[in-house]
Amino acid sequence: MKTLLRRLYGKQKTAAPADLDSYDRKVSTLRQQLPDATEQDCELIAAVQHLTMTSPERILALVNAVSYLATNQIEGDFVECGVWKGGSMVATANTLIAHGDTDRRLWLYDTFEGMSEPTEEDVDFMGQSADRLLGEQDRLQSDSIWCFSPLEQVRAVMQDTGYPESKVNFVQGKVEDTLPQTKPESIALLRLDTDWYESTRCELEHLFPRMVDGAVLIVDDYLSLIHI
């Protein structure tokens, strides 16, 4: 596991020693930051941090949710809406592999072209519109708030996890367009991270009814905007 995670942190190619030193330092820091996390948890979180904007605490919560579902054999697919570079699903896939649970289908919904435009509903608690905030960012910069990351890059990091490729579904496009046509029959884990009101509402309308008993729902942007 540690060799795989060090390779992930090294961006799948031969990593420079400085990169691996940085990875080891991150693991050490996470041990102190997350006292309830296992050594394996810290290694995994350190390995995916360059692939996600999600905090270590939230990644750990996701890993714990996946472990709960695998340990209790709660059947159903795992779904993420709003993938960006794939960090959360990489953490999910690695956790499933660690539990010997590789028969589940993983669904990754994203435009893979950056975030869709916000609407007038997307206002923070300070009264600032998301449209104004995004207007200050370069849409094509991968680390900007627009969250641009091409499908090919996300597919590559998912392949590097070793999770069966036949079980990984990439659904490209706005969820408002794709979900009415393409969605799983049953869901054990539903993680929503598309930020905006309209997309989140669409996801809940189409996917929440398909969640099985004992399933886990994670809304990453809950209370980040007035209407979410």
Predicted regions and their residues:
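SAM cofactor-binding core of SAM-dependent methyltransferases
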Residues: 56-150
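Conserved small/polar residues in nucleotide/adenosyl-binding loops
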Residues: 226-228
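Class I SAM-dependent methyltransferase Rossmann-like catalytic core
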Residues: 28-74
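A generic secondary-structure signal
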Residues: 65-68, 95-98, 156-160, 178, ...
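A short helix-to-beta-strand connector/capping loop
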Residues: 102-104, 163-169
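Membrane-proximal basic amphipathic "stem/tether" segments
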Residues: 1-41, 45-46
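Short alpha-helix
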Residues: 147-159
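Active-site segment flanking the S-adenosylmethionine/decSAM binding pocket
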Residues: 166-224
